[in-house]
Amino acid sequence: MTRHVSLLRRMLHDYPARKWRIQIDGRDISGRYILWEAMNIRSVGPALFLAPWAATKDGAFDFVCVREDDRPILMRHLDARLAGEKSKFPFSTRKFRKLKTVWKKSTFHFDDKLWPRKKQKPGSPSEIEITVKPSALLILQPAANLNARSQIIHR
């Protein structure tokens, strides 16, 4: 984990913030971001807990972002992690059901992979929409009590 946090810390030092046009649930939150994530799990990579309250069964995604002006705060958090200190991610999350953004030819991570791939050339700007659809996924989960029936979770 230390290697990954160290790499992120080095990259963050001079990583340029990019202007993103983003709406979540119809509200404009456009701005210059170093990082933003739409998450339904608590962590990315090796135990980087960006959304500690994210849950796969709550019917929402968690929006996490670090704006350009927040760079020093994120640097201090990563420094603390590298020093072995316990440090909670210092930015809040926002629950949402629908996100819209415009992708403008830069490479970004989508589900832990770079998009577009290195061999592909970025196309013209495209609108991307991420939406939570009720009951789109059915998860069978064993009950906490082994004597109880299994429960069905609708997402």
Task: Describe the function of each predicted region.
Residues 1-155:
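Long C-terminal subdomains/extensions of small-metabolite kinases
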